[in-house]
């Protein structure tokens, strides 16, 4: 069926690259990702390297379940997600049932993203108790709004003020406008996120494992491998 056609096409692309020296027609590539600036930066690097006269590339910043679905249906070659001790058992079961694999790239200590003008901005480390008075911002996950699909680490600490958003720009505007905060990997890009956002280590939370998912029946293309290498550069 469609999977066999995709595998045949992937193999044909590999052979074409091998015997034509990477020439040929319009290059196509798609990835799906949680809301990470480093995923965008790596995508920029990929286009700068392979963006010839013709190409058709896609990057989807979307919900966790949709990332899994995109790779399972082979609409995306790679999916960028994170796992931790809380969600890995459930997510690995879902990945296995969809013939997907998770490949870890980086282990990150959780950080808090806050405005540079936030009352806690001068702290070397921030605790959950100190954050209690401020709005907690997270990415909503639509129909699959389970803790296991969250883009932020699960915390046993109850958050009294919660705001859910769909996109990164809205989240950062609310961080600044409301003195809100979100929990993330701590990898920050001033060009994409702005100079007004800073990352401060969060106390008492376990590490996040950032990586990519692939389809067991698929083959990582040359573009895919180049993108993975670009990711590693930003995650160092």
Where do the protein language model's features map onto the residues?
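Short, small-residue-biased leader/transition segments that mark boundaries at the very start
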Residues: 1-6
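Short helix-loop hinge/linker segments at domain boundaries
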Residues: 9-32, 48-52, 95-101
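Flexible hinge/capping segments at coil-to-helix
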Residues: 23, 94-136
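Central regulatory/effector-binding core of bacterial HTH transcription factors
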Residues: 26-90
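Secondary-structure junction motif
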Residues: 39-42, 88, 128-157, 221-222
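Hydrophobic hinge/microswitch elements
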Residues: 72-77, 82, 141-198
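Short beta-strand->loop
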Residues: 96-107, 186-187, 194-209
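A late-sequence structural motif
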Residues: 198-236
